[in-house]
A protein has these predicted regions:
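N-terminal loops that bind phosphate or other acidic moieties
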Residues: 1-542
Length: 542
């Protein structure tokens, strides 16, 4: 697997430098200790304020370096990928940023981190520094374990301790608050994959159709494999287990964390499921969904809960400098406005025609059966969704059969236009809607059905800008409709559609559609998916 990196040994340091530059914060610096000592720190903290230091292995970005800045961390100590920073790197951070007010070390509970931060704390104390250390163990994946892992809940501790330190609280107060928050935070994660270490092969530990519950942020195996049945089930199992373990309160903060490669589209669905769940009304603040404590490219997410108090709400919602911290929000109630009446369906009165119903149903079945094949073909020359787009339109049309004006062809074509325009999406849905709408108008003028469809095709070409030879569905549709308008059989039309579709495989330049952005080498030998769909439909109907 390839990565956007240069030399492997410089992966972490170059990333730190790039992200630090992109932050635009002139008060953030790194210690001059590369490559062994990788410390990101503030330069503007008065010695009268408690310094907040955290860190651990890299590969969890933006944690922890991304949270350095006013209102959160004073320094972050970075190890190599999934490796604890050395004690002298931690000590260097302590000695650099700790003033007379002392410092608090916030340590996710992993053996290497705990030992190296602990040893550095002892050395710093021997040098006269006031140092407190809090170990965060928020992972509830394995019940009864002696040393639960520290995962995304550590951010609750960063934020609240950082707030108190910025306000000028003394070390004892900041440390006590941090310990209290750490003890109350609970986190659980679930993933559809492990993660890929740079230079190593991808591990396919999670079988298709399953998800791993409670795996660690270093890719450690989870507590169990479960059947995966979608976002709702995944959100429900995490929500149920978290609320079983978290302390009682009138409201909670939910931190919804992307573990690396989960799409924002997926994270939006998950946020909706958490907030719509039986316990959703108890969530008074939501942080994310966002990348916060990641595990390289892991396809999963974690959820963390913290019982809220008035003081916690104040601390969590206080503005901070680090851009990686997503401002907590009070969940909004869904508000829906009425559609303008002009946009509502223009459906005509339903009527019965068994032959038309059977013809449309068979057409829809033929198109739905092509979904996987067309998607695979489109993945080579487009964005891989032609089959799904066409199948969506076919499913919508078939599901509305009983509501269509089947005995009134002009109204039927207008209704098909309305349905396809609303259900299919993408350019193809709009183009077909244009064609059927124009065909319906032509039928009203008294022309035959094939001639009306030809008129619809001409309008589609006029508005869409494509023509025969541009490697689109028109290459199959135009000769087929011309044959039907000329009195030829459906079989003859299907044969011409097939010739047109096959010809697109030898067109090395596309004049319209997504394929216009694809190189000639990739187009060669691959027929246009839309043209093939037309040919296969007519062949199935002939």
């Amino acid at each position: 697997m390839n990565f956007f990196a240069n030399a492997k040994e410089n992966f972490v340091t170059e990333s730190i430098d790039g992200l630090r530059r992109a932050s635009g914060d002139p008060s953030i610096a790194t210690l001059d200790g590369y490559p062994h000592i990788k410390v990101v720190c503030r330069t503007d903290l008065p010695s009268s304020k408690v310094a907040i230091i955290s860190g651990g292995g890299s590969g969890h970005e933006p944690s922890h370096a991304g949270f350095v800045g006013k209102g959160m961390l004073t320094a972050a100590v970075c190890g190599e990928i999934f490796a604890s920073p050395s004690f002298d790197a931690v000590l260097a951070a302590i000695l650099t940023v700790t003033g007379k007010a002392g410092c608090l070390l916030i340590v996710p509970n992993y053996t290497g981190d705990r030992l190296n931060f602990g040893l550095a704390a002892e050395r710093a104390r021997a040098l006269g520094k006031k140092v407190e250390m809090v170990v965060v163990s928020d992972d509830i994946a394995i019940p009864g374990i002696a040393q639960p892992r520290g995962v995304a809940g550590v951010l609750f501790v960063h934020k609240i301790a950082g707030y108190l330190a910025e306000k000028g609280a003394n070390l004892a107060t900041v440390a006590a608050a941090a310990r209290s928050v750490a003890a109350k935070s609970v986190t659980l994660g679930i993933s559809l994959s492990s993660c890929t270490l740079p230079g190593a092969g991808r591990e396919d530990r999670v079988p298709p159709g399953q998800a791993e519950l409670g795996l660690g942020i270093h890719g450690e195996p989870g507590v169990e494999m479960i059947d995966f049945s979608g976002a709702k089930a995944a959100a429900d199992i995490l929500c149920d287990r978290l609320f079983e373990r978290v302390g009682k309160a009138s409201g909670y903060a939910l931190l919804l964390n992307n573990l690396g490669s989960t799409m924002l589209l997926e994270m939006g669905v998950l946020a909706n499921e958490f907030l719509s769940s039986a316990n959703g009304r108890k969530i008074k603040l939501i942080i994310g969904p966002s990348l916060m404590v990641t595990s390289l490219d892991m396809h999963g997410f974690s959820a963390s809960l913290l019982p809220l108090t008035r003081d916690y709400i104040t601390a969590l919602t206080a503005p901070v400098a680090p851009r990686a911290w997503p401002s907590p929000r009070t969940p909004a109630r869904l508000k829906r406005l009425k559609l303008p009446k002009e946009v509502k369906s223009t459906a005509s009165k339903p009527s019965r025609n068994d032959a038309a119903a059977a013809f449309i149903a068979k057409s829809c079945d033929l198109l739905m059966a092509l979904e996987t094949e067309l998607n695979a073909l489109d993945a080579k020359v487009g964005d891989g969704d032609t089959g799904s787009t066409i199948a969506t339109g076919a499913r919508s049309l078939k599901s509305h059969l009983s509501k269509l004006p089947l005995a009134d062809n002009p109204s039927l074509l207008a209704s098909i236009s309305d349905l396809l325009g609303k259900s299919m999406g993408g350019s193809s849905g709009v183009l077909l809607a244009i064609m059927f709408a124009a065909a319906g108008q032509a039928l009203k003028a008294g022309v035959s059905l094939p001639a009306a469809l030809q008129a619809g095709l001409e309008r589609m070409k006029e508005i869409g800008g494509a023509k025969t030879g541009d490697r689109t569905m028109i290459d199959a549709l135009e000769p087929a409709l011309a044959a039907l308008a000329g009195g030829k059989s459906l079989s003859a039309a299907a044969a011409l559609a097939r010739q047109g579709a096959d010809a697109t495989a030898y067109m090395t330049r596309a004049g319209a559609g997504r394929s216009t952005y694809v190189s000639s080498a990739n187009l060669k030998g691959v027929p246009d998916p839309g043209a093939l769909a037309v040919a296969r439909l007519l062949e199935g109907l002939a």
